[in-house]
Each structure stands twice: as structure tokens, then as C-alpha cells.
Swiss-Prot record:
Its EC number is 2.1.1.192. Specifically methylates position 2 of adenine 2503 in 23S rRNA and position 2 of adenine 37 in tRNAs. It comes from Thermobifida fusca (strain YX). Reaction proceeds by a ping-pong mechanism involving intermediate methylation of a conserved cysteine residue. Disulfide bonds join 119-357. The lineage of its organism: Bacteria, Bacillati, Actinomycetota, Actinomycetes, Streptosporangiales. Binds 1 [4Fe-4S] cluster. The cluster is coordinated with 3 cysteines and an exchangeable S-adenosyl-L-methionine. S-adenosyl-L-methionine binds at residues 181-182, 215, 238-240, 314. This is Probable dual-specificity RNA methyltransferase RlmN.
Amino acid sequence: MPAELTFVAPRRTPPPRHLADLDPQERRDAVAELGEKPFRARQLAQHYFGRLEADTARMTDLPAASRERLGEALLPQLLTPVKHVTCDNGMTRKTLWRAFDGVLVESVLMRYPDRVTLCVSSQAGCGMNCPFCATGQAGLTRNLSTAEIVDQVVSSARDLARGTVAGGPGRISNIVFMGMGEPLANYKRVLAAIRRITDPVPDGLGISQRGITVSTVGLVPAIEKLTAERMQVRLAVSLHAPDDELRDELVPVNHRWKVAEVLDAAWRYADTTGRRVSIEYALIRDINDQAWRADLLGRLVAGRLAHVNLIPLNPTPGSKWTASRPEVEREFVRRLRSHGVSVTVRDTRGREIDGACGQLAASGA
């Protein structure tokens, strides 16, 4: 029997309205409703998105009488950091956040010599039930709001700008929607979050669309919707098996949309946007790392605007599976390259702090 999937999040009390939930016109309307002049919306956005400031007491260009009113109405605290855990000499930091309703989510900040990447969560938990993923095994609690997604970025960017992260002051250059949740199952809020992240300051954070990656297990209708947006974000497809028999087991949504359908949607995305699709493939010892599966994957991807990202399986509590042997991994890479396929093995960050791919479970509060 196919594993149970949850596409619609349980109904819960929504988070309070926040500036980042609103587009520029909605912000002006919201400010006007509070009896303030509409241009205060731009000032507020300049502080939040431009200066990464959420404390209205520091917004001295706003009238003192307005600060508290605007702060309470449009800048409520949505996420509170519970703890930070680091590894890689502080260059990788996992943050556990508590939302307004007590829900826990995680994000991971990764500093590299040439870039800084933040992995964000789009849901509390996940409804896709992939058996090798800690998040999927936890089930879906609720969708995150647009502002809860954006606030992970703003809060992390603030710490980075203020030099409280190892390596000194810096800026986030890349955002990957590869944290907790299936991003395309929370499509509307994720899309709005991408717009807030990429719109120029003060409307948004001004991070390039080309620096954004959205992952999916293969929700074909949502991939098609994203294609129609004609954005320049990268699509990452969590494939993990090139054949339906095995993918039905590893990625249960495959019972709904088979490998061929998922890849067809991915190729249409690449052809429409001109952006190379990333095919994510967790290598699991003696499960999906056989030479014939490497050859099958190579034939499926050859000639496409795509790159295969091999991920040594990250351990999760109670998992019966482990990463492929090094020699098997090397042979898998060799066979893919023999088909002319671009392939790399992911430099997995955060494994020691349960912050790597498939390990986020918002535990340890």
C-alpha cells in the first residue's frame, strides 16, 4: 500500500500579519488603515529589508508616536531563535526557531569562500513521507506563512551583517528552499516569499533570482505553474531513483506522478526559463547505487539542460539505510559522465549537527 501523503496542511490559527506578507501596495493600504501617511510604508520597508532592522525603537526617522503602533501592527515577532548549533569552525550554523504558536522549524546558514547560502524551511514538517528523510517521517504540522519564510532570511542576514557569524560581516548570496517541507505544496506563500527576497530594496531584499533554488519531490502541476511564472530561480528535483519501481518506495509521491512525468515537467521548466535543472539523487548503499541505475539515470538526463547532484545519504535516527561505499560512489559518477552528464557529489555541510539534507527535524529544543 502506498505511503500516506499530505498535500493540504492542517488548519491552524494563522500567524499575525507582518510587513513581509504584503506587497508594496498592500503595505501602503495597511499603513493608511492605521491612520499613518502611506509613505511610512516605504520607510518601514527600508528599515526591515534594507537595514535588516525589526525593532521600531531604532527607527528614529519615524515619529515616536507612530513607532509602537506600526511595530505592533506590521512587525510582530514571528520567529524566536531557540538555539544555534555550529560546525565547520563556525562556518555552518543551524538555527532552531520557535514560531508564535510554539511550532519549531530550522534553517541552516553555510559560509563558503565565494558565497553564503541559507537553507530555509517552507513548512513545519513535511507531508511527503519519504522514508529516508527525518523531516518527512515527522509528518506535516502546518505551512509557514510568507513572512515566516522571509524572516528566516532577514534574521540570518542581520546576524551575518553584524558579524555575529564566524568569518566576519557578510551578505547572503544564495537561498535554497531545501529545509523542512515540500516548497511547492505551499506554493502561494513560497512564491510570495521569493518575490520578497528578490524584489529590489526597499520592496524586498534584492537577492538575485538566479541565486534562489526551489526543490520539489515532483509535484507536476506546481512545477508547471512555476514554469509559467518565468522566473529565473533554479528548480531542483529530488529524484533519488531513475525507475518507478524503486522511486515508488523512496519517494511515495511517485505513485501520483511517475518519473517520466516529473522529468518531462522539469525539462519544460529548463526549456522555458533557460535555467539548468538540478537532479538531486541521494546515494543509498545497495538500494539505488547500482551501476545499471547510474546508466539509466544517465540516459534519462543526457542531452538535457540539467546537472546531477549526488548526495551521500545523511544518517537519520532509526534509519535502516546508509551512504554508498566510496568506490561505488566513484563508479556511479564515472558512469554518469560516460553519458555526457554533468555531475558533482555534494559537499555535505552540517552532518554533525543534524543540519544536512534530510536531517532537519526541529528536535532538541
